[in-house]
Curated annotation (Swiss-Prot):
It holds the Pfam family DEP. Residues 459-468 have a biased composition (Low complexity). Coiled coil: none annotated. This is DEP domain-containing protein 1A. PANTHER family: DEP DOMAIN-CONTAINING, DEP DOMAIN-CONTAINING PROTEIN 1A. Keywords: GTPase activation. One of its GO terms (biological process) is intracellular signal transduction. Residues 147-173, 306-326, 459-485 are annotated as: Disordered. Residues 281-321 form the Rho-GAP domain.
Length: 800
């Protein structure tokens, strides 16, 4: 018996149940067995059933080879509980099946479960209406075709019989609303299957998802993949878009315009002010929980290494739980048959001919190169810093640097300072050309060989001179009038002036995240050694001296993708374990790809343009420094994190989550914000499947369509309740009176019972006693003629 693929949709677990039970009953071999001196025919042992059903599930296209034997035993227990099978003595209803030689057989009843024709909520409402009090219930013959149309407009019921076939054909056609519902259901089903969750309850409310946004974001895009808005009032204003293009294509954008010192900082502030003026973040408050749970599900968290001799509690907030497997553990006992069946569905990539979801579970193989370097008795140079975060050298002397990953540089704007003049320290006008002549040999064993250290600038100056110079620069920077900002970005620009600074320790108030980029446009964000309660940590970041030239193509438009960049190595101090599991990185990209389709088109367009702008800015070597201390990439992430993700109730964890999400989106914006082709193919396949069912003459029936009653007021309902019920009872009394087949005695009995229960209706029918007596007036009896009786008697006597 051949199997067919159960497509995603409502009642999928029921369809899978029917499919498996059909195949099991049709193919399970039955034999004669002997047990306890008795012979049983057409039965099978439990171990044989487990073996056969296990092979069936592994070879079935709906489940796949990942089905375990324990899951098969659990499914057979559900079969025994639901009377798909029974033991040879006819017992069933319990899940006491074991993988042994116990004998079982198939019952004579059908194990298939009926698929409901309407949602459960409607059924509960209809049953509650049917259970209302109705005192006088009479049985009668009813036409079922009239009952099925009781909720339809009466004008459509009175249509002639000849047009019924045409109406059926028209009802099978898919409307625009039906197509929107298909888009919504397929998208949410793919997202639910991708994250491996039984349901999205508590994270996403499907009723609040607008399917028109999904269709618009999938279809209304330009050649660069950016959403095109029909309503231009929702688009970015012209001045904001021009400012974003200016920063993205710096310095070649509109070079004829006059510029001044600090022009790029003013433009950057203009763009940030615009995004902070929006009423909601770009990912909206509605989907805050959804995006946060995607990060948690994909393991985008850090787990600090436990120190020897200490036992940390896993429940503490500064020790996050390790990432869990997104799929249901097959060893668990499933109390629900639906969860058990859905857990058996195959999880690997499905063939293109079988399902359009061939790309959902594809994971990207990532090569990691670990190297161990120990730095002792060495001063931290300014080239060692990354994104403006530092570590006290006293710690570097005491502690060995653990394993680090070789990763490309996230930005070539930081870490290269001209050492010929101390007065130019931490200024935005510094150039990278000073280290262009100090290129390193690519065949060196370590990024920190002596020939590379010529490109690094040592801060071997007195603590007083460096501290005074830094304080002067900060006071000059803070002298400008600045717009009040939320604390998520305000701490980037505010540095404690009275804090002690030395040549070996510069403590910056805010930057706590190290963000790097991989050669294949993937990324990882390292939050190093920081509990959630203390955000002011310090770390050492060692950056290689050589830098390749990564210049933006200024002739391109802002909406075009950023150019590819060659890889380079970065050895980073990383005292924690892996940050993002490589096997789940592709899952996170595709999950965010589906989640961003739920956004309003205007928010999605702004998110696309913002991510393309900050991605280009972080890669542009010609971009002047936007802050004297903070690195360009860190400044971009911390500035726009609250503009992208934020919740209505601000908590302490909000900033870290928003920073991590924006860092991930920056490095994967081309994959996350592109239109998923597999989703479009899945919707088209589902629509074509429904159309083929409607056009097939031998199909099971039309597509089920639901009709609903017109809502009326309470007063009108009370009037209809009285009038309709009383008229029906009056008709009942009239039928009793006019019934000629009923005897007078029985008729009197029923009329008296009716008079007792409904005196008002009876008094309206018989207002006076005369009308009642007239109905039951005794009719005169006609006696037979006496002569005929005499003749009959005489004749009888003569014959005798």
């Amino acid at each position: 018996m051949s199997s067919h693929i159960v497509t995603p949709g409502p009642y999928r677990a029921t369809k899978l149940w029917n499919e498996v039970t059909k195949l099991f009953r049709a193919g399970m071999p039955l034999k004669k067995h002997r047990q306890h001196f008795r012979v049983y025919t057409n039965c099978f042992t439990a171990s044989t059933a487990v073996d056969w059903l296990h092979e069936l599930l592994k070879n079935n296209s709906n489940f796949g080879p990942d089905v375990t034997r324990q899951q098969t035993v659990q499914l057979l227990k559900k079969f025994l509980k639901n009377h798909v099978i029974e033991d040879v003595k006819g017992r069933w209803g319990m899940e006491d099946l074991e993988d042994n030689s116990q004998l079982y057989r198939f019952p004579s009843t059908s194990p298939l479960k009926p698929i409901p024709n309407r949602p459960t909520v409607m059924r509960r409402k209809s049953l509650s209406m049917m259970d209302r009090e109705s005192f006088f219930k009479f049985r009668g013959s009813k036409k079922f075709d009239k009952e099925t149309l009781e909720n339809v407009d009466p004008e459509t019921q009175e249509s002639p019989v000849g047009s019924s076939s045409g109406e059926t054909e028209r009802s099978r056609e898919l409307t625009e609303d039906d197509i929107h519902v298909i888009w919504k259901n397929v998208t949410l089903t793919h997202l639910q299957k991708l994250v491996g969750s039984a349901s999205l309850e508590g994270v996403l409310d499907p009723a609040k998802v607008n399917p028109q946004f999904i269709v618009y974001n999938m279809t209304k895009v330009n050649k660069h993949g950016v959403v095109s808005l029909e309503d231009k009032t929702e688009d970015l204003p012209h001045w904001a878009l021009s400012a974003m293009k200016c920063l993205a294509n710096w310095p070649k954008y509109d070079s004829d315009q006059p510029t001044y010192l600090g022009f790029e900082r003013d433009v950057f502030k203009t763009v940030s002010d615009y995004f902070y003026s929006l009423p909601q973040p770009l990912l909206t408050y509605q989907y805050y929980e959804l995006f946060v749970n995607i990060l948690v599900m994909c393991g985008y968290i850090t787990t600090p290494k436990s120190q020897p001799g200490k036992r940390k509690n896993q429940e503490e907030p500064n020790c996050p739980q390790p990432a869990k497997n997104p799929y249901v553990n097959p060893a668990n006992l499933f109390r629900s048959t639906e969860y058990l069946l859905l857990s058996l569905i195959r999880k690997e990539a499905i063939d293109e001919a079988d399902s359009p979801m061939k790309e959902v579970f594809s994971s990207k193989t990532e090569t990691k190169l670990d190297t161990r370097r120990v730095f002792r008795g060495r001063r931290v140079s300014d080239g060692d810093r990354l994104d403006g975060s530092y570590l006290d050298v006293s710690q570097a002397h005491k502690t060995d640097v653990p394993y680090g990953r070789l990763r490309p540089r996230s930005c070539s704007l930081e870490g290269n300072i001209n050492n010929c003049a101390k007065s130019r320290l931490f200024r935005s006008s510094e150039s990278l050309e000073s280290c262009s002549s100090d290129k390193s040999n690519p065949e060196t064993d370590s990024p920190l060989e002596p020939n590379l250290q010529s490109s690094l600038v040592s801060i071997n100056t007195s603590g007083s001179s460096v501290s005074s110079q830094l304080s002067a620069d900060l006071r000059r920077n803070n002298s400008r009038p600045a717009r009040a900002r939320p604390r998520s970005i305000g701490n980037l620009f505010d540095i404690e002036e009275n804090r002690e600074m030395s040549a070996s320790s510069f403590s910056v108030h805010a930057p706590v995240a190290e963000i790097t980029m991989r050669p294949d446009s993937t990324s990882s964000v390292g939050f190093r050694g920081l509990g959630l309660s203390s955000l002011h940590g310090s770390c050492v970041d060692v950056r290689t001296g050589p830098s390749f030239s990564r210049r933006c193509q200024s002739s391109l438009d802002l909406s075009k993708p950023a150019p590819a960049r060659p890889p380079s190595a970065l050895l980073t101090h990383q005292p924690e374990q892996s940050l993002l599991q490589p096997s789940l990185e592709q899952v996170a990209v595709e999950a965010l790809q589906l989640c961003t389709l739920l956004l309003p088109p205007a928010s999605r367009r702004k998110l696309q343009l913002l991510l393309r702008m900050i991605s280009r800015m972080s890669q542009n070597v010609d971009m002047p420094r936007l802050h004297d201390v903070i690195g360009t990439r860190t400044l971009l992430v911390q500035t726009f994190s609250r503009c992208v993700l934020s919740c209505e109730e601000v908590d302490d964890l909000d900033e870290l989550l928003a920073t991590r999400l924006l860092s991930f989106l920056m490095d994967h914006h081309q994959e996350v914000l592109q239109v998923p082709v597999y989703l479009r193919n899945a919707v088209e396949d589902h629509i074509n499947y429904l159309k083929s069912l409607s056009s097939c003459p031998g199909s099971a029936g039309p597509i089920p369509s639901y009709s609903f009653c017109r809502q009326i007021s309470c007063q009108e309902f009370e009037q209809q309740k009285l009038s309709v019920s009383q008229s029906a009872l009056a008709d009942l009394l009239e039928n009793i009176i006019k019934d000629k087949s009923m005897s007078v005695k029985e008729k009197k009995k029923k009329i008296k019972l009716f008079q007792k229960e409904y005196p008002d209706i009876y008094s309206r029918r018989f207002p006076t006693t005369e009308s009642e007596t007239q109905l039951f007036a005794d009719k005169p009896k006609i006696k037979p003629p006496m002569l005929l009786s005499i003749k009959k008697a005489k004749t009888f006597s003569i014959r005798n």
